UniProtKB/Swiss-Prot annotation:
Top-level division of the source organism's lineage: Eukaryota
Keyword Transmembrane helix (UniProt): no
The protein, known as: V-type proton ATPase subunit d
Bilayer topology: Peripheral membrane protein
Recorded family membership: Belongs to the V-ATPase V0D/AC39 subunit family.
GO CC aspect terms: fungal-type vacuole membrane; vacuolar proton-transporting V-type ATPase complex; vacuolar proton-transporting V-type ATPase, V0 domain
Quaternary data: V-ATPase is a heteromultimeric enzyme composed of a peripheral catalytic V1 complex (components A to H) attached to an integral membrane V0 proton pore complex (components: a, c, c', c'', d, e, f and VOA1).
An example Gene Ontology molecular-function term: proton-transporting ATPase activity, rotational mechanism
Record's subcellular location: Vacuole membrane
GO terms, biological process: vacuolar acidification; vacuolar transport
Length: 364
């Protein structure tokens, strides 16, 4: 009965998204891409998957232009799915865009603080984080006007009202603002998928809980590691941790008290995956690519490498389930990683860094 009712409203969307998932690049595609000698060769390899979107690129395009066109495909497909979604699935997809909105608003706040023309910043905003009233924010000439506009004109208003004031919006606090908004967003999203009548007790709640708990844990760990050597107090740091996840509450309490990498490692020992990440990365590892991507296995990977790899594995497994909105979230994450992979390979080709070209993450 659950499947019957799901397919009445959402069967078409599920079919479309599974088709998008089947068009993702495979390890064979990546192997062929790493053999390319130029960006134009790479364009040819990407032709079957991205042809229509790459057609307008000039010869010898920049890697940033290539990345923008591959992002355009994700945006186009996402908007098509969203246009055909209805009811709780439409609201679910709106939640997916809030993370991008947070990044866009943080960018506009930073630009306003530096007295930049915020209209120029609109071009740098992520298209999935665009909302109808975003141009209104560009009318603001100072941080107070921007804050008042955000409080009224954006879907993020509830996340601001609950914990941020005008005094928080300064250059030193911008990352704290971003992380506070993300904390409120993740908690709201987690509550939504576990309490909405269409999702509570369904595969959507089960799979999305795993995905969001992983994201909450990753952010808590990264916030802790990035706070070392800064003026952020332990009490303020603790306020940035989402109040759910595999580490919550004991692990996050230990994270809030950690003074060094060893303290973080001890805090995550209760979760086998995270413990193995720290052991393999040697307490943090080093960067290996944009987003700190890494190749196969765990050898030579940074901590963030392994978080990305784990996220891809969870997202891949989401497609083994039926009758769930979670495949939309998983598909977006998988496509984002594909874009990072393409950009990384293109950068290595452009800079003639072939020895590092295999540092990408492929799960298919």
């Amino acid at each position: 009965m659950e499947g019957l009712l799901f397919n009445v409203n959402n069967g078409y969307i599920e079919g479309i998204v599974r088709g998008y998932r089947n068009s993702l690049l495979t390890s064979t595609n990546y192997t062929n891409m790493t053999q390319c000698e130029s960006i134009d060769d790479l364009k040819l390899q990407l032709g079957p998957a991205y042809g229509d979107f790459l057609a307008s690129l000039p010869p010898k395009p920049s890697t940033s232009a290539l990345a923008a066109k591959t992002t355009d495909k994700l945006v186009s497909e996402f908007r098509y799915v969203r246009a055909n979604a209805a009811g709780s699935l439409a609201k679910f997809m709106d939640y997916l865009t809030y993370g991008y909105m947070i990044d866009n608003v943080a960018l506009l706040i930073t630009g306003t603080l530096h007295e930049r023309d915020t209209r120029e910043l609109l071009e740098r905003c992520h298209p999935l984080g665009w909302f109808e009233t975003m141009p209104v924010l560009c009318v603001a000439t100072n941080i107070e006007e921007l804050y008042n506009s955000v409080m009224i004109e954006t879907p993020l208003a509830p996340y601001f009202k609950s914990s941020l004031s005008l005094q928080d919006l300064d250059e030193l606090n911008i990352e704290i603002v971003r992380n506070t908004l993300y904390k409120n967003y993740l908690e709201d999203f987690y509550h939504f998928v576990n309490t909405h009548p269409d999702m509570a007790g369904t595969p959507t709640a089960e799979v999305m809980s795993e995905l969001l708990e992983f994201e909450a844990d990753r952010r808590a760990i990264n916030i802790t590691l990035n706070s070392f050597g800064t003026e952020l107090s332990k009490a303020d740091r603790k306020k940035l941790y989402p109040n759910f996840g595999q580490l919550y509450p004991e692990g996050t309490l230990m994270l809030s008290r950690a003074d060094d990498f060893e303290g973080v490692r001890l805090a995550v020992e209760g979760v086998a995956d995270y413990k193995s990440f720290f052991d393999a990365a040697g307490l943090g590892g080093g960067p290996s690519g944009p987003g700190n991507m890494g190749g196969g296995g765990t050898e030579g990977k940074s901590l963030e490498d392994m978080f990305y790899q784990k996220e891809m594995e969870i997202s891949k497994m989401a497609f083994t389930r039926q009758f769930t909105y979670a495949i939309v979230y998983a598909w977006v994450k998988l496509r984002e990683q594909e874009i990072r992979n393409i950009t990384w390979i293109a950068e290595c080709i452009a800079q003639n860094q072939k020895e590092r070209i295999n540092n990408y993450i492929s799960v298919f």
